[in-house]
């Protein structure tokens, strides 16, 4: 089996975890108590969903997941919620005091007290796997636990499980709904620390998700539940190929192979379509061509940036539901002629396509309409550097005045770490810039003279 272990860190990670596992259970027909009426084989079968669920002798399906937070309230909701019987109590790990939005607390002071316990639980899950393929880590950039503890965990996972893939789903801080003033500090510190440990990171910009909820679902004041259910759909689309048999089964390493041209440039942009409310879906066709076209609209992206200003390095389209290759090829051909999609000149303009015949599922009573087909596009584009530039700018404004820095230094960090992290981010922006520059024609001419 090619198992994946999901690790949900901090409030954002845990709440997205709730949305994802709720959706996975619906997709696979697993009840809140872990029983699965449709699954006739008792014990670990060789079904695709076993990559995400382990099976006990009693026929109970348990998520291969760990929930970690440095304070108990958020995970207590899981312990008392609808799906409390689904998880093993040891999978829900809480500390006593939170990281107080402080990266240094999550990474040094409080984080180090709980890290060994967390790694121990992850080890138990890993031991149940026959062929662990990697980890999916869910966290936010802005929180103390999400930023600090995640980066500590990623460092330790690299030591313990060297070659296993680590994919991140990171919540990028949104200006509208900021939960902390120091989000830019935390984001840049965590990105710097995890950059070399993460193989691929899907960023989700809260603001972009907010706008999609407002615009496409007519929700005036979206709550975190609305946001997380939408994020859940995206995560589900990305992981569907790992959990179902499809025409093109992508495993974790295949994502990297197709989306990551250089180790540092591993931040694909995710776009999902159709996001539509039930009353609207009734009147629309939502053909393959339409949903594919929607993926190239900046309005449907998970991060606010404009790919029309950047260049693509890679592009994957993951379809699910009633989709045939003929329609997909036609849709892509149309887009290639109509849209100005610029690829970097060193990359062939191929679109990688995955089709999964399992139609998208929606949470009953949720905001999204049940549709026949959906698509999630993962593209690696130089435009995502805009997101880093925004964050770096905010970091600079505060750091120029050394605002709030004493809180970090007081928890055992050194001021040098700030400037080091900021330099690394500047280098990352530069990397993106260089990738997009056309390869120098001059080089070829000089070689010609030598011969």
Swiss-Prot record:
<dbReference type="GO" id="GO:0021987">
    <property type="term" value="P:cerebral cortex development"/>
</dbReference>
<keyword id="KW-0597">Phosphoprotein</keyword>
<dbReference type="GO" id="GO:0001764">
    <property type="term" value="P:neuron migration"/>
</dbReference>
<dbReference type="GO" id="GO:0008344">
    <property type="term" value="P:adult locomotory behavior"/>
</dbReference>
<dbReference type="InterPro" id="IPR003008">
    <property type="entry name" value="Tubulin_FtsZ_GTPase"/>
</dbReference>
<dbReference type="GO" id="GO:0005829">
    <property type="term" value="C:cytosol"/>
</dbReference>
<dbReference type="GO" id="GO:0001964">
    <property type="term" value="P:startle response"/>
</dbReference>
<dbReference type="GO" id="GO:1902065">
    <property type="term" value="P:response to L-glutamate"/>
</dbReference>
<keyword id="KW-0007">Acetylation</keyword>
<dbReference type="GO" id="GO:0034612">
    <property type="term" value="P:response to tumor necrosis factor"/>
</dbReference>
<feature type="region of interest" description="Disordered">
    <location>
        <begin position="432"/>
        <end position="451"/>
    </location>
</feature>
<feature type="active site">
    <location>
        <position position="254"/>
    </location>
</feature>
<dbReference type="GO" id="GO:0035641">
    <property type="term" value="P:locomotory exploration behavior"/>
</dbReference>
<dbReference type="GO" id="GO:0005886">
    <property type="term" value="C:plasma membrane"/>
</dbReference>
<keyword id="KW-0451">Lissencephaly</keyword>
<dbReference type="GO" id="GO:0005874">
    <property type="term" value="C:microtubule"/>
</dbReference>
<dbReference type="GO" id="GO:0036464">
    <property type="term" value="C:cytoplasmic ribonucleoprotein granule"/>
</dbReference>
<dbReference type="GO" id="GO:0046872">
    <property type="term" value="F:metal ion binding"/>
</dbReference>
<dbReference type="GO" id="GO:0005198">
    <property type="term" value="F:structural molecule activity"/>
</dbReference>
<dbReference type="InterPro" id="IPR017975">
    <property type="entry name" value="Tubulin_CS"/>
</dbReference>
<dbReference type="InterPro" id="IPR008280">
    <property type="entry name" value="Tub_FtsZ_C"/>
</dbReference>
<dbReference type="InterPro" id="IPR036525">
    <property type="entry name" value="Tubulin/FtsZ_GTPase_sf"/>
</dbReference>
<feature type="binding site">
    <location>
        <position position="179"/>
    </location>
    <ligand>
        <name>GTP</name>
    </ligand>
</feature>
<dbReference type="InterPro" id="IPR023123">
    <property type="entry name" value="Tubulin_C"/>
</dbReference>
<feature type="binding site">
    <location>
        <position position="140"/>
    </location>
    <ligand>
        <name>GTP</name>
    </ligand>
</feature>
<dbReference type="GO" id="GO:0000226">
    <property type="term" value="P:microtubule cytoskeleton organization"/>
</dbReference>
<dbReference type="GO" id="GO:0005200">
    <property type="term" value="F:structural constituent of cytoskeleton"/>
</dbReference>
<keyword id="KW-0342">GTP-binding</keyword>
<comment type="similarity">
    <text>Belongs to the tubulin family.</text>
</comment>
<comment type="function">
    <text>Tubulin is the major constituent of microtubules, a cylinder consisting of laterally associated linear protofilaments composed of alpha- and beta-tubulin heterodimers. Microtubules grow by the addition of GTP-tubulin dimers to the microtubule end, where a stabilizing cap forms. Below the cap, tubulin dimers are in GDP-bound state, owing to GTPase activity of alpha-tubulin.</text>
</comment>
<keyword id="KW-0206">Cytoskeleton</keyword>
<keyword id="KW-0963">Cytoplasm</keyword>
<dbReference type="GO" id="GO:0005525">
    <property type="term" value="F:GTP binding"/>
</dbReference>
<dbReference type="GO" id="GO:0042802">
    <property type="term" value="F:identical protein binding"/>
</dbReference>
<dbReference type="GO" id="GO:0000793">
    <property type="term" value="C:condensed chromosome"/>
</dbReference>
<dbReference type="GO" id="GO:0008542">
    <property type="term" value="P:visual learning"/>
</dbReference>
<dbReference type="InterPro" id="IPR037103">
    <property type="entry name" value="Tubulin/FtsZ-like_C"/>
</dbReference>
<dbReference type="GO" id="GO:0009612">
    <property type="term" value="P:response to mechanical stimulus"/>
</dbReference>
<dbReference type="GO" id="GO:0031594">
    <property type="term" value="C:neuromuscular junction"/>
</dbReference>
<dbReference type="InterPro" id="IPR002452">
    <property type="entry name" value="Alpha_tubulin"/>
</dbReference>
<dbReference type="GO" id="GO:0051301">
    <property type="term" value="P:cell division"/>
</dbReference>
<dbReference type="GO" id="GO:0007224">
    <property type="term" value="P:smoothened signaling pathway"/>
</dbReference>
